[in-house]
C-alpha cells in the first residue's frame, strides 16, 4: 500500500473512532466549524514553516515541515469528507 494512502486511511479511522490519546482525534473532535478552524490554523502554520525552511535552503527541514504540511492537509481533507480516491482522481485529471 502507498504510504500516503496508508496515512490517509489511518487519519480517516481516527476521525471516526476517536481513540483516546490520538492527536487526530483531539484535533477533529470539536464541533465541525471549530475543528476545521483549528486544522486550517495548523495548515497555515505548517505552510509558513515550509516557506521558512525553503528560504533557508535547509533540505532536511523542508522535508520535515513538508511532511507536517501534507499530514495536516490530509486531516483537513478527511475532516471535510474528501476521500483519498477523490483526491487521486483530481491528480489524474491534471496529468494530461
From Swiss-Prot:
Pfam families listed in its UniProt record: PRA-PH
Keyword terms: Amino-acid biosynthesis, ATP-binding, Cytoplasm, Histidine biosynthesis, Hydrolase, Nucleotide-binding
InterPro entries cross-referenced by the UniProt entry: HisE (IPR008179), PRib-ATP_PPHydrolase-like (IPR021130)
Any one annotated GO CC term: cytoplasm
Single GO BP term: L-histidine biosynthetic process
Catalysed reaction equations from the record: 1-(5-phospho-beta-D-ribosyl)-ATP + H2O = 1-(5-phospho-beta-D-ribosyl)-5'-AMP + diphosphate + H(+)
Name of the molecule in the record: Phosphoribosyl-ATP pyrophosphatase
